[in-house]
């Protein structure tokens, strides 16, 4: 059987062997608290490459120490991080997968001790600390930190960079009127609220000529927040700036009750793909081979991003291939167990 799921996908000169992407998921496993790659990362990510995932995106990696979600996150704010990341890249590529990294700043959702920063001095919830409103100097330093992170990612050998503009972290905080009450050129109108992300994309593109993805939260799930329709002009601008694919998630900029069900975010990816004319990745409770194939076959997205499913089963591509009646190449060491 010919499937879209197991067909190659090419973006900006990089060809993935299939359309299966490991979604960036924080492991909170840097026990040294210095942002460096640890043994866990060297086992966790290559295991999915052995499992035949096409593209593995490393978890949200802090572009500054205070930009981490927690002290146990990976970092890319210092040249000392390059060696460990380079080693991780080599291990993943050795087993046939492409590898990307998600550059991130947690903004007001950072749980690192010390001062936290955000577009406006609005806490995430009642139990969260109030962040410092960023000055223009803070903004300039943070844009520079994203560029420096991209430069280090290139030195480490990554194939793809994804900018984290979702889930209520710093860039998402600038985009949403729920968290951005600024009165300068970085707040107010939708165009102004996009300004920070626009500067980050331009800064990254100055030093990075490879595939560039952006993860977005296509709905704030709040009557006064952003909807998927609001994201269409944002994504069109991203495309003009050289973004190659938008990874479409949703929520988490403010506390909200979200009804989740199989493929609940796929319609967002489909809408963005159709209305903005850009390749998209679908993510969120995609669990079976047939479900993933339906999303791709019907043109609802170009790639499928799997999160928890790949935590449960590093060899999900094999299970999906068996389900769809597709024979895929097995690691030589596993051939006896992968025959069907």
UniProtKB/Swiss-Prot annotation:
The keyword NADP applies. Its cofactor is FMN. Substrate binds at residues 28, 164-167. FMN binds at residues 23-26, 60, 102, 215, 307-308. One of its GO terms (molecular function) is FMN binding. Disulfide bonds: none annotated. Pfam families: Oxidored_FMN (PF00724). The keyword Oxidoreductase applies. It catalyses: A + NADPH + H(+) = AH2 + NADP(+). One of its GO terms (biological process) is response to toxic substance. Its EC number is 1.6.99.1. Keywords: Detoxification, Flavoprotein, FMN, NADP, Oxidoreductase. Coiled coil: none annotated. Signal peptide: none annotated. It comes from the Bacteria. Catalyzes the reduction of the double bond of an array of alpha,beta-unsaturated aldehydes and ketones. It also reduces the nitro group of nitroester and nitroaromatic compounds. It could have a role in detoxification processes. Belongs to the NADH:flavin oxidoreductase/NADH oxidase family. NamA subfamily. Homotetramer. NCBIfam families: PRK13523.1 (NF010047). This is NADPH dehydrogenase.
């Amino acid at each position: 059987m010919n499937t879209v799921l197991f067909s190659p996908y090419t973006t900006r000169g990089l060809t993935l062997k299939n359309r299966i992407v490991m979604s960036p998921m924080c492991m909170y496993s840097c026990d040294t608290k210095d942002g460096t790659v640890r043994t866990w990362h060297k086992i966790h990510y290559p295991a999915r490459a052995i499992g035949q995932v096409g593209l593995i995106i490393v978890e949200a990696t802090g572009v500054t120490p205070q930009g981490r979600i927690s002290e146990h996150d990976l970092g890319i704010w210092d040249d000392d991080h390059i060696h460990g990341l380079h080693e991780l890249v080599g291990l993943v590529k050795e087993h046939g997968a492409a590898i990307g990294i998600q550059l991130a700043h947690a903004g007001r959702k950072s749980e690192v001790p010390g001062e936290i920063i955000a577009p406006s001095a609005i806490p995430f919830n009642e139990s969260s600390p109030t962040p410092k409103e960023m000055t223009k100097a803070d903004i300039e330093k943070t844009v520079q930190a994203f560029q420096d992170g991209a430069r280090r990612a290139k030195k480490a050998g990554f194939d793809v960079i994804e900018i984290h503009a979702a889930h209520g972290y710093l860039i998402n905080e600038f985009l949403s009127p729920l968290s951005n009450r600024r009165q300068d050129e970085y707040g107010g109108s939708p165009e102004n609220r996009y300004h920070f992300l626009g500067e980050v994309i331009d800064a990254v593109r100055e030093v990075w000529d490879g595939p560039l993805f952006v993860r977005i939260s296509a709905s704030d799930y709040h009557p006064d927040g952003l909807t998927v329709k609001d994201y269409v002009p944002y994504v069109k601008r991203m495309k003009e700036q050289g973004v190659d694919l938008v990874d479409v998630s949703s929520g988490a900029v403010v506390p909200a009750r979200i009804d989740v069900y199989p493929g609940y975010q796929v319609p967002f990816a489909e809408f963005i793909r159709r209305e903005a004319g850009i390749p998209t990745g679908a993510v969120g409770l995609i669990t079976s081979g047939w479900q993933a194939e339906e999303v791709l076959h019907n043109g609802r997205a170009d790639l499928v991003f799997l999160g928890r499913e790949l935590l449960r089963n590093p060899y999900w591509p094999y299970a999906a291939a068996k389900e769809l009646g597709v024979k895929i190449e097995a690691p030589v060491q596993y051939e006896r167990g992968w025959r069907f």
